[in-house]
Amino acid sequence: MFDVDDSCLHEEDFLYVPEFRLYLESYKKANGTGLSRKTINRHMTNVMDFLYYSSTHNYNVDTEGPDEVPIDIAFLKRGNDYFSSYFDGWLLHNYESEDSIRQSVTSVKKFYRFLKETGRIESAVADHILEELKEY
C-alpha cells in the first residue's frame, strides 16, 4: 500500500469500510467456506486504495480536473472513464503485475456488491457499474 496523506482524506469518504470488513468476514463462497484472513486483508487494502484514489482524484463529470468537494456516494456512480483512469492508469503505475490489477478489480466488485446489498447505492446503478467492471 502507498503512503497516505491524511490531510486530504475526509471521514465520510471511508464511512463504509468497517461495515465492508464485517461483510467480507461473513461472506460465503459457493462451496460454503468463508474468506481467509489474508484474502479479507487483501480486499480491504485494495478497497482502501480505491477509496483513497477516489478521494484525491474526485473528477466532476463536467470538468477535467479534480474537485475540491469531499466525495460522497456520488463518486461511486462514475462511469467507465473513471474506472479506466483508475485501473488502466493509476494502478499500472503502482503495481507490477496484471494479477494485482485483477485482484483489485475483484475487490472493488465486492465493494459495489456490498453497497448494493446494504442499500447504500441503488440496485440499477450498482448493476450498471458491475457490468462496466467486467471489462477489466
Q: Predicted regions: what is each one?
A:
Residues D3, S26-K29, F87, N94:
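Generic signal for short, ordered secondary-structure residues
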Residues N60-P66, E117-Y136:
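Short, charged hinge/linker segments at domain and secondary-structure junctions
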Residues T33-E117:
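Non-catalytic DNA-binding core/recognition domains of DNA-processing enzymes
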Residues C8-Y52:
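N-terminal "first-domain core" detector
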Residues L15, E19, Y82, Y86, ...:
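Exposed alpha-helical structural elements
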Residues D5, L9, E68, T118:
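Sparse, context-dependent recognition of short Cys/His-centered cofactor- or disulfide-binding micro-motifs
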Residues Y23, Y86, W90, E132:
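Residues that form generic nucleotide/phosphate-binding pockets
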Residues M1-H10, E135:
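Intrinsic N-terminal pre-sequences and regulatory tails
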